[in-house]
């Protein structure tokens, strides 16, 4: 099982949904960088469960503790170890699936591959693991911002509801770009929960201030690296860079160049896998949460046809808590790409 990502600075995550702890180890970190648990906690609070009626009701405080690699709030260059306790586990909710596979989950494929699985909340495959990505990735946020790079994301679509972008809002809920849609969002999520269902979502990410020439041709393209990382997030099904090319011809999407710069940005800031200095535009689609409390047809480990009902506490829409995870992983990608570019300079 591969539990690490990164090129120069590498991050390893560990722990399971219903284990004692989850955590992350950052290796290859440079020294003398200020890091505070308070700053990490602020970012973790953006994704933690039980922050609204529209997320899982699992009550985890996600309190992070740094154990190594820090002295007087500065990195020493040694590996940085972070741990988060799991406090609100209800493993008994999953007793009925100890031998049954939940459709849409990792149960079936994990069992095929490893011949054994932790069925409690999905074990290692649970989105609980993404707290580790936020805790470790957000430490690069200020480094990225100090270089003039701004990473911002918003929810573009929930189920069939398209949310028209109006402005960046950082006061009430920074992930919704148009407060006029809040009541509609509440209605469709409430209706979804009441019918024991879940919804898909689409997230748009715009990165401004990226320097040109980040990324390498062919097998280390910046868009292939981003895809590799972001598609590892639970429930992601597709990723797109730039704007919709479907049913378009060349003249409609070609970004012409003048000595003053590009006249458009249909390619989303990337050409041939290398940044061109324009805003980087990414769209990610999340499938509906697989766990719902309806009875559904499946099989058990003996390949017997059965019907099964999933209990436990689950998000009605994954995208509502996905934005901090996406942004934290992008910080990790970008700092690695920036450091790698310096090697060639």
UniProtKB/Swiss-Prot annotation:
Keywords: Amino-acid biosynthesis, Aromatic amino acid biosynthesis, Lyase
Gene Ontology cellular component list: cytosol
EC number: 4.2.3.5
Top EC class, one word: lyase
GO terms under biological process: amino acid biosynthetic process; aromatic amino acid family biosynthetic process; chorismate biosynthetic process
Gene3D superfamilies reported for this sequence: Chorismate synthase AroC
Catalytic activity: 5-O-(1-carboxyvinyl)-3-phosphoshikimate = chorismate + phosphate
Cofactor(s) the record lists: FMNH2
Record-linked PROSITE patterns: CHORISMATE_SYNTHASE_3
GO molecular function, one term: FMN binding
Top-level taxon: Bacteria
Pathway this chain belongs to: Metabolic intermediate biosynthesis; chorismate biosynthesis; chorismate from D-erythrose 4-phosphate and phosphoenolpyruvate: step 7/7
Signal peptide: none
Subunit relationships: Homotetramer.
Family under the similarity heading: Belongs to the chorismate synthase family.
PANTHER family named among the record's database cross-references: CHORISMATE SYNTHASE (PTHR21085:SF0)
UniProt name for this protein: Chorismate synthase
Record organism: Carsonella ruddii (strain PV)
């Amino acid at each position: 099982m591969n539990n690490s990502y990164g090129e120069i600075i590498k991050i390893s995550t560990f722990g399971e949904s219903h284990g004692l702890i989850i955590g992350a180890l950052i290796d290859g970190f440079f020294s003398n960088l200020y890091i505070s648990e308070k700053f990490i906690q602020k970012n973790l609070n953006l994704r933690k469960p039980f922050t609204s009626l529209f997320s899982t009701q699992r009550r985890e405080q996600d309190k992070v503790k740094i154990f190594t690699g820090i002295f007087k709030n500065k990195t020493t260059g040694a590996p940085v170890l972070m741990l988060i306790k799991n406090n609100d586990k209800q493993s008994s909710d999953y007793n009925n699936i100890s031998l049954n596979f939940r459709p849409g989950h990792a149960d079936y494929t994990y069992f095929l591959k490893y011949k054994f699985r932790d069925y409690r909340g999905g074990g290692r495959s649970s989105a609980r693991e993404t707290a580790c990505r936020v805790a470790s990735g957000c430490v690069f946020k200020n480094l990225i911002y100090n270089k003039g790079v701004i990473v911002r994301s918003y929810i573009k679509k929930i189920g069939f509801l398209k949310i028209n972008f109006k402005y960046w809002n950082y006061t009430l809920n920074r992930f919704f770009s148009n407060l006029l849609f809040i009541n509609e969002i509440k209605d469709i999520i409430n209706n979804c929960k009441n019918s024991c269902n879940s919804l898909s979502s689409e997230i748009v990410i715009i990165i401004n201030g990226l320097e040109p020439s980040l990324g390498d041709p062919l097998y280390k393209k910046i868009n292939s690296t981003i895809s590799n990382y972001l598609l590892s997030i639970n429930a992601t099904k597709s990723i797109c860079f730039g704007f919709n090319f479907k049913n378009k011809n060349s003249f409609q999407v070609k970004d012409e160049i003048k000595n003053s710069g590009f006249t458009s940005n249909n390619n989303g800031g990337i050409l041939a896998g290398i940044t061109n200095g324009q805003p980087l535009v990414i769209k990610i689609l999340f499938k509906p949460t697989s766990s719902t409390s309806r009875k559904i047809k499946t099989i058990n480990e003996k390949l017997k046809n059965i019907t099964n009902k999933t209990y436990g506490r689950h998000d009605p829409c994954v995208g509502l808590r996905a934005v901090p995870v996406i942004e934290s992983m992008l910080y990790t990608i970008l700092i690695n790409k920036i450091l790698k570019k310096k090697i060639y300079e």
